């Protein structure tokens, strides 16, 4: 938990965790190290003097500028401070890299990651400006492997009216009453079936099992494909495809990128078959059932007009990416945090059992609003997202010199708006490393604002499916704590290269009846 986001269905792909496969970059870094040493004088001078040009004219321009490039260190030639960045990612507190430099240089500082001079912001107000000034001032910045794999016209790369139109279309569909009623039932069915299978297993690895469930739900929303052989093949091809998101950008046969591109071809072929079948049977008299329907019915995209099936198939594949890591990780960490906090779990059980008894007495089915009305459950979700930091930030490239709060971000430089630094800031959140769902009842206005809590990103690329993501987690938690008890084995969170559990969170699950307490935890 930057694409990427921001934790969920249709989390903006731009909020993908970075880097996704750090070993490729370590190898690349050491391969170019020798060349870097030979070119050290030239590289070092270039990086150190990137904020100026030669001659008296540049000196005059600098006098006119009010802002200054933030202080900081560019580290070693070529590799910069990459090794420190990675080392902190493996620690129990990955934000240490940011905190150390914040104490030395302030909340906004410069550094060098993988030979690229960047500016890192741990300031919520600066992050807000970066997120909101999208398209005309900042554009997404990605490793070359991502652009090679997804193409120049992917959801990640498009800007302006095209991006805004797609975002609006998907957002409107995900908020539609028609979808809310249907998807609530679909998620319930998938969750109930998945949890029932857990009770039959001697040991459940939560991270793996939830990933299967959330992928099925995501594909159901995207293209109405039900579980079965086609779904299994689709998932296998998708897993092969996303392995190439962050890798050495070489396309020779046998390389990671080459294999992923081939998997993408097979994946798009499978999706295209569904899209073409839908085109033949398409009708506009009934509400859209999934995202395929939404995109096929939209007539406002010039690119789509020539090859609608190719356009829609490509976009569907791209929309699968955010759900692969964010939703499963959020649910898994919710189980982890609750397992370590029996008091919070007891309160969660109490709230959800009360709603379950009320619905049984009334003989009513659950609705979207029922799940979202569970206030403490929403507190648990917010606290999980704050601490998990599945999307630790977003990367942007400045299209021109930009001044924010006295800091100058030069044209062509990348800026990392760090979400994790804000979420773990002691000046905003008391005891930020403590799992405390009750903080959301007493939290001050500044911490609860959109600039201080950004698990779904922000600005024009705010995750359009954030409400749906919270619904899915709410349904999962409700049925877990009202139907089952579990004992969790010892496990720890790994924050690099992506957030995950070291042992995939093994638990033992047992069923409970309404009169029994679902709480059954090992001592921690």
Swiss-Prot record:
Cofactor(s) named in the record: heme
Cellular compartments annotated: Endoplasmic reticulum membrane
Protein name per UniProt: 3-epi-6-deoxocathasterone 23-monooxygenase CYP90C1
Keyword line: Brassinosteroid biosynthesis, Endoplasmic reticulum, Heme, Iron, Lipid biosynthesis, Lipid metabolism, Membrane, Metal-binding, Monooxygenase, Oxidoreductase, Steroid biosynthesis, Transmembrane, Transmembrane helix
Cited CDD domains: CYP90-like
Top-level taxonomic group: Eukaryota
Sites where the protein binds heme: 463
Membrane topology qualifier: Single-pass membrane protein
UniProt enzyme class: oxidoreductase
GO biological process, one term: brassinosteroid homeostasis
Enzyme Commission number: 1.14.14.147, 1.14.14.-
Tissue expression notes: Widely expressed.
GO molecular function, one term: 22alpha-hydroxysteroid 23-monooxygenase activity
Stated family: Belongs to the cytochrome P450 family.
Organism this protein belongs to: Arabidopsis thaliana (Mouse-ear cress)
Functional description taken from the UniProt entry: Involved in brassinosteroid (BR) biosynthesis. Converts typhasterol (TY) to cathasterone (CS) and 6-deoxotyphasterol (6-deoxoTY) to 6-deoxocathasterone (6-deoxoCT).
GO CC terms, sorted: endoplasmic reticulum membrane
Alphabetical list of InterPro entries matching this protein: Cyt_P450, Cyt_P450_CS, Cyt_P450_E_grp-IV, Cyt_P450_sf
Lineage, top ranks: Eukaryota, Viridiplantae, Streptophyta, Embryophyta, Tracheophyta
Knocked-out gene: effects: Plants with short petioles and round leaves. Altered polar elongation of leaf cells. The double mutant plants cyp90c1 and cyp90d1 exhibit a characteristic brassinosteroid-deficient dwarf phenotype.
